[in-house]
């Protein structure tokens, strides 16, 4: 329960930052900054890269999809590309950051349940999924290389409004405590918002509170899930699952496959990768300790394979949101979701060709 409270407190601060930076105009400026950098022949691949940047900065796949879906529709209308491939690029980029961002609720849940540092998990995770991201860029570029796109709408941006995201991203990368980073981001967002005229002094607490209230549903669900997991553990359910998994695996490689499959299938059942990590985290922790799996890798595989599941199931929030915003069906978008599938392939290859490294100290 104490770990759950710490995790939810961190998520609430994350969403306070999200509320503050959105009100300060940070989302619009970040999107426009990315769009202004897209070469004309690189429109769809550029959507993927912008989605990666925004989702890593914002820590939310849903927010990324909401911000970029209208732009994807516009690019589709002006180039003749199928809207499914344009929104597919957005969803792929959103899932990249959902897995990697150090202020994502999935990352917070993964590192807290496995007992490792965020920056260590990021480094281990990043080098596993980097080939998937590069291949995805090449696929989108090759599929759309014969079309040009010229953005006619206003894409004005302010680097001051992007500053809070950069502070949070760089602060997290160099290893500053996540609470310090997020609180700094909130303060900078409020200063920028007030100075730019986006936030009135009387609205400062309101915009921060709006971010916190967005956490209500996931907080309640996480508490209920944690209680259920504790009851299951008390009555021997987790031990039963552990014994079942242990009987099927042998050594570290088998343990990592067990963690990956467990994470994927639980996400497929819950359709929520944060909830799936909260549920499978204690079991993955037991497996990693039993078979001496590096906690950085167990956290990475938990986060990766729940993201793989979340990125391809037609009833997941990300695909449902993308479909609603574009008037498509999830099944029309799924064939263009190259990144989640490639991330899964890279994860499997990372397990098969795992490096022989010493186990790190558990925090």
Q: Which residues fall in each region the model found?
A:
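Single conserved hydrophobic/aromatic residue that forms the stacking wall/gate
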Residues: 1-13
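Membrane-interfacial loop-to-helix junctions in multi-pass transporters
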Residues: 6-7, 33-50, 76-86, 155-163, ...
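Juxtamembrane helix-boundary/capping and inter-helix hinge elements in multi-pass membrane proteins
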Residues: 7, 80-84, 109-121, 234-237, ...
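Hydrophobic alpha-helical transmembrane segments of multi-pass integral membrane proteins
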Residues: 14-17, 39-71, 92, 245-285, ...
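Transmembrane alpha-helix boundary signature
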Residues: 17-34, 59-62, 83, 199
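Re-entrant/interfacial helical elements at transmembrane boundaries that shape
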Residues: 63-74, 91, 102-116, 240-242, ...
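Juxtamembrane and boundary regions of transmembrane helices in multi-pass small-molecule transporters
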Residues: 92-95, 99-156, 160, 170, ...
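Flexible hinge motifs at transmembrane-helix junctions and intramembrane kinks/re-entrant loops
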Residues: 163-195, 202, 356-357
């Amino acid at each position: 329960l104490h770990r759950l409270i710490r995790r939810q407190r961190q998520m609430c601060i994350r969403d306070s930052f999200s509320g503050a930076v959105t009100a300060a105009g940070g989302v619009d400026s970040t999107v426009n900054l990315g769009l202004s950098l897209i070469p004309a022949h690189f429109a769809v691949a550029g959507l993927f890269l912008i989605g990666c940047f925004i989702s890593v900065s914002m820590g939310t796949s849903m927010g990324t999809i909401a911000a970029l879906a209208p732009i994807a529709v516009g690019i589709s209308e002006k180039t003749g590309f199928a809207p499914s491939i344009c929104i597919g690029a957005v969803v792929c980029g959103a899932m990249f950051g959902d897995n990697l961002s150090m202020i994502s609720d999935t990352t917070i849940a993964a590192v807290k349940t496995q007992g490792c540092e965020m920056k260590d998990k990021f480094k281990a995770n990043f080098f596993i999924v980097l080939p998937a991201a590069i291949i995805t860029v090449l696929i989108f570029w090759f599929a759309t290389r014969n079309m040009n796109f010229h953005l006619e709408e206003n894409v004005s941006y302010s680097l001051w409004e992007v500053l809070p995201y950069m502070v949070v991203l760089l602060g997290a990368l160099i290893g500053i405590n996540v609470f310090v980073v997020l609180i700094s981001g909130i303060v900078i967002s409020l200063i920028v918002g007030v100075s730019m005229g986006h936030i009135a002094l009387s609205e400062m607490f309101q915009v921060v509170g709006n971010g916190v209230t967005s956490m209500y549903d996931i907080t309640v669900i996480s508490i209920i899930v944690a209680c259920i997991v504790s009851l299951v553990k008390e009555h021997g359910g987790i031990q039963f699952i552990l014994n079942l998994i242990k009987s099927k695996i042998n050594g570290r490689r088998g343990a990592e496959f067990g963690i990956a499959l467990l994470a994927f299938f639980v996400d497929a059942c819950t359709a929520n990768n944060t909830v799936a990590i909260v549920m499978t985290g204690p079991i993955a922790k037991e497996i990693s300790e039993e078979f001496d799996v590096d906690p950085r890798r167990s956290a990475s595989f938990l986060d990766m394979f729940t993201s793989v599941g979340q990125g391809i199931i037609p009833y997941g929030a990300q695909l449902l949101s993308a479909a609603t915003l574009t008037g498509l069906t999830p099944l029309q978008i799924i064939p263009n979701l190259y990144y989640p599938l490639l991330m899964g392939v890279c994860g499997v290859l990372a397990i098969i060709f795992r490096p022989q490294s010493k186990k790190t100290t558990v925090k």
